UniProtKB/Swiss-Prot annotation:
Testis-specific. There is a cross-link at residue 138 (Glycyl lysine isopeptide (Lys-Gly) (interchain with G-Cter in ubiquitin)). Keywords: Chromosome, DNA-binding, Glycoprotein, Isopeptide bond, Nucleosome core, Nucleus, Phosphoprotein, Ubl conjugation. A motif (SPKK motif 2) lies at residues 9-12. Residues 9-52 have a biased composition (Basic residues). It comes from Lytechinus pictus (Painted sea urchin). Glycans are attached at residue 130. A motif (SPKK motif 3) lies at residues 14-17. It comes from the Eukaryota. Monoubiquitination of Lys-138 gives a specific tag for epigenetic transcriptional activation and is also prerequisite for histone H3 'Lys-4' and 'Lys-79' methylation. Phosphorylated on SPKK motifs 3, 4 and 5; which may regulate DNA binding. Dephosphorylated during maturation of spermatids to mature sperm and rephosphorylated at fertilization. Pfam families: Histone. Contains 5 SPKK motifs which may interact with the minor groove of A/T-rich DNA sites. Phosphorylation of this motif may regulate DNA binding. This motif is reiterated in both termini of histone H1 and in the C-terminus of plant H2A, but its presence in the N-terminus seems to be unique to sea urchin histones H2B. This is Histone H2B.2, sperm. One of its GO terms (molecular function) is DNA binding.
Length: 143
C-alpha cells in the first residue's frame, strides 16, 4: 500500500512533499552509485553488553553438595541471589561501623566475625563463625 505524498515523513530532514518517488531517475534505484567515498563502510563500534554479576554458580554448587538430585528455577535463583547480596551488605555495613567505633581503617576477619555474631541469631551465628574460620584457615594454608 503506497503512502500518499502529502503525509509527513517520520524521518528527520525536509518534508516528504518535494522528494521524488521510489522509482524516479532523480533518486536512483538499487544499482545507483553513491556520491562521495566509494562503497566504504563506516566503522560501527559494537557496544559490549554489561556483565551481570551474581552468586548463581556458587549457589548451584552448594545446592548440588547438599541435595544432588534437586534443581532450582531461575526465579528461585534470583531470590537466593538477592538473599546473599542482602546478607553480604548487612555484614559489610556492621563490620564498617565496628571499624569506625574502634578507629580503625581496615576491615579484618575479626570485624567480620563480630558482625556475624551481632547479626545472626544463636546457633546460626556459631555455625557461620566456625565455617568462616575454617575457610580462612584453608585459604591461608593454600598460599
Amino acid at each position: 500500500m503506497p503512502r500518499s505524498p502529502s503525509k509527513s515523513s517520520p524521518r528527520k530532514g525536509s518534508p516528504r512533499k518535494g522528494s521524488p518517488r521510489k522509482g524516479s531517475p532523480k533518486r536512483g534505484g538499487k544499482g545507483a552509485k553513491r556520491a562521495g567515498k566509494g562503497g566504504r563502510r563506516r566503522n560501527v563500534v559494537k557496544r559490549r553488553r554489561r556483565r551481570r554479576e551474581s552468586y548463581g554458580s556458587y549457589i548451584y554448587r552448594v545446592l548440588k553438595q547438599v541435595h544432588p538430585d534437586t534443581g532450582i528455577s531461575s526465579r528461585g535463583m534470583s531470590v537466593m541471589n538477592s538473599f546473599v547480596n542482602d546478607v553480604f551488605e548487612r555484614i559489610a555495613g556492621e563490620a564498617s561501623r565496628l571499624c569506625q567505633a574502634n578507629r580503625r581503617r581496615t576491615i579484618s576477619s575479626r570485624e567480620i566475625q563480630t558482625a556475624v555474631r551481632l547479626l545472626l541469631p544463636g546457633e546460626l551465628a556459631k555455625h557461620a563463625v566456625s565455617e568462616g574460620t575454617k575457610a580462612v584457615t584453608k585459604y591461608t594454608t593454600s598460599r
